[in-house]
């Protein structure tokens, strides 16, 4: 993991009404793995600093650029600043990549289960699989409240992906609204597969219970819990 380094904002795009993706250019190749995160630090003129961790949404590609998707929290020091103040051309201090547990390197079968903003590191894994032409290694299940809450709506859908809605679904959507169930996963993952679960504490616990009900063993499961990151 490198120390603090400057990162230039090269693009900003909306994912939802409350989430933006920031594409950053670093001085050197990122060297990150799918599933890792970076810390963003803000420094005020009086020297006060605030820092938060954000998962990388982009797949490793050998370049010096990466994408962070940030949900805006109304009382969040860093997320509010990123959403309301930061524009293309600004510089941010970042540190990373960080994390070696919740990572996927694109060469083993995996079941990816994400709730809400927990889809961010899962998207990095899915993008990596598609870039390598290895989508058959993945099964992806993403749970959101409603269509307007879905990150990467134009890119996420695909033959390896199941999207479910817990409160309101698009008109004509085949699955009834409701929480993740064993039927959404289908057959039990192979014994050699790793299950990645990412979301809030409640979602992570519920999803873990679901996959274990299918016979998945504890040592196959890797969990990343997402709390409010302001």
Labelled PLM ranges:
Residues 1-88, 136, 144-146, 166-168:
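Ferredoxin-reductase
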Residues 71-230:
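FNR/FR-type flavoprotein reductase catalytic core
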């Amino acid at each position: 993991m490198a120390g603090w380094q400057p990162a230039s904002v090269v693009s900003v795009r909306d994912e939802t009404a409350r989430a933006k993706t920031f594409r950053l250019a670093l001085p050197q190749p990122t060297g990150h793995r799918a599933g890792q995160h970076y810390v963003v630090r803000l420094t005020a003129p009086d020297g006060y600093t605030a820092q938060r961790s954000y998962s990388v949404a982009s797949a490793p590609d050998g370049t010096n650029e990466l994408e962070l998707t940030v949900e805006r929290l109304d009382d969040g020091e860093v997320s509010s600043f990123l959403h309301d103040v930061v524009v293309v051309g600004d510089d941010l201090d970042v540190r990373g990549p960080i994390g070696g547990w919740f990572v996927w390197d694109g060469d083993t079968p995996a079941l990816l289960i994400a709730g809400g903003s927990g889809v961010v590191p899962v998207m990095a894994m899915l993008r990596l699989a598609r870039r390598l032409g290895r989508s058959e290694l993945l099964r992806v299940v993403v749970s959101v409240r409603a269509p307007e809450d879905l990150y990467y709506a134009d890119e996420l859908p695909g033959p390896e992906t199941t999207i479910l809605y817990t409160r309101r679904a698009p008109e004509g959507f085949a699955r009834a609204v409701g929480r993740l169930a064993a039927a959404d996963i289908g057959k039990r993952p192979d014994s050699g597969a790793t299950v990645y679960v990412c979301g809030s504490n409640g979602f992570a616990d519920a999803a873990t219970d679901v996959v274990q009900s299918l016979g998945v063993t504890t040592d196959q499961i890797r969990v990343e819990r997402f709390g409010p990151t302001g």
